[in-house]
Structures are given as C-alpha cells and as structure tokens.
Amino acid sequence: NQLFKRPIETGAIAPTSKKLSKLIVETANLSNKRCIVELGPGTGVFTREIMNNIPETSEYFSLEINEEFVEETKLNNPKATVYHASAKDIKKYLTKHNQVKSDCIISGLPWGALAEDVQVDLLDEVYDSLEEGGEFLTIALLQGLVFPPGRRFKKAIKEKFRKVEKTKIVWSNIPPGFVYHCIK
C-alpha cells in the first residue's frame, strides 16, 4: 500500500470515491476549458472523470510524483497524458504542450499533509500557471481542517485567490471530503 510506503505523497487511506471525483469535475465545468492540468492523479480516479468530460479540442496533461501511480493511471486511462514529474514543474509542461497558462488546474495533492514551505511553493506555482479568471479545484479531507497544515492551506487560498468556494461534503468518501473551487 502506497500510504505506508510514501505517506506524504499519497496522503489518503483509500482512492478518492467516484462521488467526490464526479463532484470536482462537475464543479470545474470542463466543457468550456481550453487547457486542463491535473496534479497528483494518484491511481487515476479523477483522470477517468476528466477524460470522460473534456472536449476533444482541450489540452490535458497530469503530473504525478509517484512512479507506481503514474503507471497505474496510464493503465487505467490510456488516452491520458501522464508525466512522472513534480507539481512544481507545471510551467515546464505547459511549455511542452505549447501553452502559456492553464484555465483549469485540478488537484488531488494532499495539501493537508504538506510542510508549509512545500505548500507555499506549490500554491505559488499553481497560481502563476493560471490565466486571469482561471480556476483551481482541489479536494480537501474533512479531518484535515482540524490540523495546522489544513487550516494554513485554507487561509493561503483565501488570501491568494479572488474567490474561494467550498462544495458540499461527500460523506461517503473515506475519509469524508469536499472541493475547494478557487478563481484567480
């Protein structure tokens, strides 16, 4: 189990539920998105929902730091472009895809498990990689809100983005989670 091998990279005891995956993709409204970047696809649960909902004309790629997850995501989603790379490299891969900025970044990163400096660096990279009006969507696990990293992340996105909304809680996810929908 990857949680025990790499707890900071994995961040959850189980893959994200189909219900929470559907919620993040529905909230993103991908039908009008030009360039979608997925960070930390894990086993590819979001990826499947994204691939089923993006227009053929949209550019899509994902960045995953865990090599085993990269292979699993590719296996489960053969049409997806998945790179074994850090989320710190968004701009590098945007350039590789002939894009300057993204209009939608979807994240499965375990923000509530990351050290403050890593959170800050990654959030800066996300923000700088989004065009004006671009959307950043990320899951948050309910128990993360009681711990300092989760509270710090919530404060950081509210300070950085002009609009931050929270979706309903998906209680059937293990552990329960919701989506932060942030607009630059």
Language-model region placement:
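Conserved beta-strand signature within the Rossmann-like core of class I S-adenosyl-L-methionine
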Residues: E132-A140
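Glycine-rich SAM-binding Motif I of class I
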Residues: G44-R48
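Class I S-adenosyl-L-methionine
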Residues: K154-K184
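Conserved class I S-adenosyl-L-methionine
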Residues: N32-G42
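A short glycine-rich, Lys/Arg-flanked "PGG" loop and its adjoining helix->strand segment in the class I
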Residues: V120-E132
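Conserved SAM/SAH-binding beta-strand->alpha-helix loop
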Residues: N66, S86
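Class I SAM-dependent methyltransferase Rossmann-like catalytic core
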Residues: N1-S31
